[in-house]
């Protein structure tokens, strides 16, 4: 078989700057020249080498380089995060675990994961053009509550760092998968950014639009469009505004819109195990089918920060919200494997979140060689999720949850190089389930009417760690942390066999993570890190 595979990226970059100074590099690049970046995902701002945890930082330069050849979040994380599974090259991230377990995905601290009914799309919820850097904290943790049994992935969006009154960038790129399929293999991307600072006000506006060509394998055959990345149109818009109320007080607003839909002339052709693969062929899709993908994902926050609100104490408060609508692939009625009362259909997930976070950060200074950093506060999250069919029927009813959580994180530093960390978080989650009827697989199946009610979860999670940083070439740490998850509760409820909520098994998963590792920095030219971990839970973390 003759194999052919080509990829042709072409990129043009333009810059708009103030007349006083020409711009020779991305304004964000200078930030990445710092040898060690301060991370915030651990809730205590700190260098990753003394965080007593395995942390990976994917900086702006790495993201920009990857975006030229693979502007897809799943591929980027899989290739640049040790311990994370590679992308499946589909829209689904179900198999893309972190240390073998699911991770909690955040955008500027806003949860993208949908625990009441998983979309398996939480990684693909923002375009790479809007991202400044990504912080990955590996291992079970409850720093942000439910869902991080494999770790945390916090996607930090861009903001202006130039100080110029106005600057900008425009990029245009094109690609093709196969020169012999040019009519269907071509794709393109357009990205425009404007940013600047005027007095006390700073701003950044970023817009991106792209289309991928039809996915083609090395032999020139179309890949099946089911859950495919081919023929996908993606739109992203980011707005970030900041205002300095005073030298110590700041107000910041962020809004991000993301859409990714597949519009293809291909239809899937089923394969046969060990004989022929599933492929894509030209054809007309079912008239009942609509374009699959994420129709919208809105994320927004308003944040107030104050340094030295009172003696040696900073304060941060934020309110945030998100709204998501994802549509899955169309399933034609199959008598051998019936669902939805034996009919064709297309399911979706609708998810809405609203929450707030308040935290104080206090420094207790005992001497030059002994001080403690305390972070304490309260988190609240309201979450509402349903899984309807596009035709209006409900496969899973609207579930609502309220999550209240006080927390405390401490970090004590002795002799400037020994760090001892301890943290605790108490989560109280109340999930409200309405009365509902199970959508049967066949009309001849017995009807199941479930009496709704409340599911209550109480969880206390602890973390403790010690790191030693006196010798840059060898900076070891040991750590223990706990996480918990009520992963995909709706999937259990939609297939209920019992008519009373209390008879349905909905136990949460609690994980324990033990870890020993080290960071090494040899004269700033060679940086190494490694760890050994053991994670355990009594219950499985997937269905």
Predicted regions mapped to residue ranges:
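N-terminal periplasmic "start-of-domain" segments of outer-membrane beta-barrel proteins
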Residues: 33-68, 152
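Extracytoplasmic beta-strand/coil segments of soluble accessory domains associated
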Residues: 74-114
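A beta-strand signature from Gram-negative outer-membrane beta-barrel systems
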Residues: 128-169
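Signature of Gram-negative outer-membrane beta-barrel scaffolds
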Residues: 374-471, 486
């Amino acid at each position: 078989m003759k194999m052919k595979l080509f990829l042709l990226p072409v990129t043009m970059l333009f810059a708009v700057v103030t007349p006083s100074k020409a711009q020779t590099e991305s304004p964000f690049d200078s930030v990445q020249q710092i040898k060690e970046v301060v991370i915030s995902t651990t809730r205590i701002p700190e260098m990753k080498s003394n965080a007593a945890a395995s942390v990976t930082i994917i900086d702006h330069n790495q993201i920009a380089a990857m975006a030229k050849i693979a502007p897809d979040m799943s591929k980027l994380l899989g290739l640049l995060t040790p311990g994370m599974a590679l992308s499946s090259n589909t829209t689904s991230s179900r198999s893309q675990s972190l240390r073998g377990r699911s991770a909690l995905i955040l955008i500027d601290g806003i949860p993208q994961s949908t625990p009441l009914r998983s979309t398996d799309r939480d990684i693909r919820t923002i375009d790479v053009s809007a991202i400044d850097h990504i912080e990955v904290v590996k291992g079970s943790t409850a720093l942000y509550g439910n869902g991080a049994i494999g770790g945390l992935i916090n996607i930090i969006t861009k903001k202006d760092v130039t100080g110029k009154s106005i600057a900008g960038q425009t990029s245009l790129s094109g690609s093709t998968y196969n020169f012999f399929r040019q009519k269907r293999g071509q794709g393109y991307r357009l990205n425009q950014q404007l940013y600047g600072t005027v007095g006390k006000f700073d701003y950044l506006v970023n817009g991106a639009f792209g289309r991928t060509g039809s996915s083609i394998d090395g032999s020139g055959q179309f890949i099946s469009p089911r859950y495919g990345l081919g023929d996908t149109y993606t739109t992203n818009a980011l707005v970030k505004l900041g205002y300095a109320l005073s030298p110590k007080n700041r107000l910041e607003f962020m809004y991000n819109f993301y859409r990714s839909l597949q519009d293809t002339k291909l239809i899937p052709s089923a394969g046969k195990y060990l004989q022929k693969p599933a492929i894509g062929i030209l054809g007309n899709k079912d008239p009942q089918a609509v374009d699959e993908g994420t129709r919208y994902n809105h994320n927004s926050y308003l944040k107030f920060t104050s340094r030295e609100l009172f003696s040696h104490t900073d304060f941060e408060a934020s309110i945030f919200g998100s709204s998501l609508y994802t549509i899955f692939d169309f399933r034609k009625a199959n008598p051998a494997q019936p669902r939805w009362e034996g009919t064709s259909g297309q399911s979706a997930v609708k998810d809405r979140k609203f929450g707030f976070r308040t935290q104080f950060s206090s420094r207790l200074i005992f001497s030059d060689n002994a001080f403690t950093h305390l972070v304490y506060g309260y988190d609240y999250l309201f979450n509402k999720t349903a899984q309807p069919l596009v035709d209006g029927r409900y496969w899973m009813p609207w579930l609502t949850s309220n999550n209240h959580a006080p927390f405390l994180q401490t970090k004590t530093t002795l002799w400037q190089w020994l760090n001892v960390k301890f943290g605790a978080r108490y989560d109280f989650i109340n999930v409200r389930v309405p009365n509902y009827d199970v959508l049967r697989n066949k009309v001849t199946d017995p009807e199941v009417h479930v009496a709704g009610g409340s599911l209550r979860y109480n969880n206390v999670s602890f973390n403790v760690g010690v790191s030693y940083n006196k010798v840059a070439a060898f900076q070891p740490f040991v750590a223990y942390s706990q996480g918990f998850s009520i992963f995909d509760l709706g999937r259990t409820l939609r297939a209920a066999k019992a008519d009373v909520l209390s008879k349905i098994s909905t136990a949460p998963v609690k994980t324990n993570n033990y870890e020993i590792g080290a960071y090494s920095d040899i004269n700033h030219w060679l940086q190494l890190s490694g760890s050994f971990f053991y994670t355990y839970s009594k219950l499985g973390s997937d269905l």
